[in-house]
Amino acid sequence: MVALSNALSRVFGSLAGYEFPSFIQKGINALYVKIFKIDLSEFEPLENYKSLNALFTRSLKKERPFDKAPNICIAPCDALITECAFLDNDSALQIKGMPYKAHELVGEINPLNPSFFYANFYLSPKDYHHYHAPCDLEILEARYFAGKLLPVNKPSLHKNNNLFVGNERVTLVAKDVQGNRLYFVAVGALNVGKMRFNFDKNIQTNAKARFTQTYSYNPPIKVKKGDNLGNFEMGSTIVLFIQNTAFKDLKEKSVKFGESIGEFHAN
């Protein structure tokens, strides 16, 4: 199953990256935009993308404004927040009724502190596929975990136990603006060609080699709130674990990168 889902995703990624003659590619792009009801008002027109992958990974034409105050946490991506809550004895939900252990997802030996709040950001095929820093960060490690590439949509989340933990993923281990530990987890999915990280091109995902690898940064990599951390090559999920933060009521709400979603408490 692992080999099949990953092989299918590699094949899809290769096809999505193929550049057809411009008149054919324009038609393919137009069909994709129509099927998934993609709003291109913030992006280049569909004829400007030389492949489906270029359309998937489109960049914003203009920077989005966001609150620069250091105590404000912003949405890292355009997404539907499917679950969010404080951890309960290290348990988080991938979807209602489907718990998993947070420490297993992020790659820690011990359970996470109950002060962690988590939020699942589901990026659908129509969404902007880049992910950004939710606050000023110092990235200490990037942990790559090999795994399956099962779909991360709601039917799949209801069907498959421990889906996030079993899927390929990259966990960014960081310090937030207050110096507290923060985890930013990019979860792979079926037909996601790759997950890319702008601060370290050495991080390889959806490769044939099936191994776990840790990339350590000393000194830490400093990024500013709103900085582009990377992108999926198709929609998937970001899981954010963050401490000492008062979040808004977010469950089942769609958010855009740059929207204020919470406020840090004083330590």
From Swiss-Prot:
InterPro entries for the chain: PS_Dcarbxylase, PSD-B, PSD_type1_pro
Keywords: Cell membrane, Decarboxylase, Lipid biosynthesis, Lipid metabolism, Lyase, Membrane, Phospholipid biosynthesis, Phospholipid metabolism, Pyruvate, Zymogen
Pyruvic acid (Ser): residues carrying this PTM: S236
Cofactor(s) needed: pyruvate
Subcellular location: Cell membrane
NCBIfam families found in the cross-reference section: PRK03934.1, PS_decarb
Task of the protein: Catalyzes the formation of phosphatidylethanolamine (PtdEtn) from phosphatidylserine (PtdSer).
Protein name: Phosphatidylserine decarboxylase proenzyme
